[in-house]
Design a protein with these regions (language model features):
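Conserved N-terminal phosphate-binding loop of PLP-dependent enzymes in the Aspartate aminotransferase
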Residues: 1-287
């Protein structure tokens, strides 16, 4: 109740809203966490059988090795006028894990990473229209899919996702398709001058009938930039992107959540000829 008086909705993240789980009974705030345990403000201890930090803490809360390294880095200094050498080291490691990629950019959140990737891909393809399959954040470009039909994102985000404030001029720039429905995607490409295909590699169901391979070939044949959003799927079943397991490479891939094990970091990796379009548009952020 106190939070709702000062924070719209009561929480910063929709998925952490206690009303989604058990209204008036679900503990909304924590005092500390360790491994798979969370302590609330009253000192009660819970075993987290839910999201483990919305899927971020794949190694458990406050992993001792990771926290030791984080604390050491913090003690060496905070943000300065100069750049951090860790950016280069992590970028090189991500490229090493994904040999098809050559360049990397970092962001703080998945929503921001998706917006950066879309900007780069639109610049590279020279086309505005995007076909999407999955959950890709909260920014205007994505939510515009619901303009004119409030049910377009039902299978990807939530039923009748509210989009007030999203410019109506973005209508008919983003089109959704269902996972494993290749014919639906093909029709979008044929009818709407699609320049970018953005999708999750896999979520609740596995790809069937070489779905990912067909998407890759379609993108290559039509000069479309293919983006795999692996904010959710990356660094779980494989050490890197889940696309490695399926042996299908995108032009751009996005990683988050498990990448930082509870610390805010996201990465956009991609082919050099695509990623260099960063230099043709303004993409910059202090943090």
């Amino acid at each position: 109740k106190r939070a709702k008086q000062i924070i719209p909705g009561g929480t910063m993240l929709f998925s952490k809203n206690p009303d989604l789980f058990l209204p008036d009974r679900w503990p909304a705030y924590f005092s500390k966490s360790k491994r798979c345990k969370i302590w609330d403000l009253d000192g009660d201890c819970y075993t987290d059988l839910s999201y483990m930090g919305v899927g971020t803490n794949v190694l458990g809360y406050s992993h001792p090795y990771i926290e030791k390294k984080v604390i050491k880095t913090i003690k060496s200094g905070s943000m300065t006028t100069l750049n951090s050498v860790e950016e280069i080291r992590l970028a090189e490691k991500l490229v090493e894990l994904h040999p098809w990629s050559e360049m990397v950019r970092f962001t703080r959140s998945g929503g921001e990473a998706n917006s950066v990737a879309i900007r780069i891909a639109r610049a590279a393809s020279g086309r505005d229209n995007v076909a999407i399959c999955g959950y890709h954040g909260w920014h205007d470009w994505y939510l515009s899919c619901n303009i004119g039909n409030k049910n377009n994102l039902n299978q990807h985000l939530m039923n009748e996702a509210p989009i007030q404030g999203v410019p109506t001029s973005l209508k008919n720039t983003v089109f959704q398709f269902e996972y494993n429905n290749f014919l639906q995607l093909k029709k979008l490409v044929e009818n709407y001058n699609i320049g970018v295909i953005k999708m999750e590699v896999q979520r609740n169901v596995e790809p069937k009938n070489n779905f990912l391979g067909k998407v890759r070939k379609l993108a290559s044949d039509r000069g479309i930039v293919l983006i795999f959003d692996e904010c959710t799927s990356g660094f779980r079943q494989t050490f890197g992107g889940l696309h490695r397991y399926h042996k299908v490479n995108p032009d751009i891939a996005i990683f988050g959540k498990a990448l930082g094990n509870g610390h805010a970091i996201n990465a956009i990796i991609g082919r050099k000829d695509v990623m260099e379009f960063c230099n043709s548009t303004f993409i910059s952020s202090t943090f």
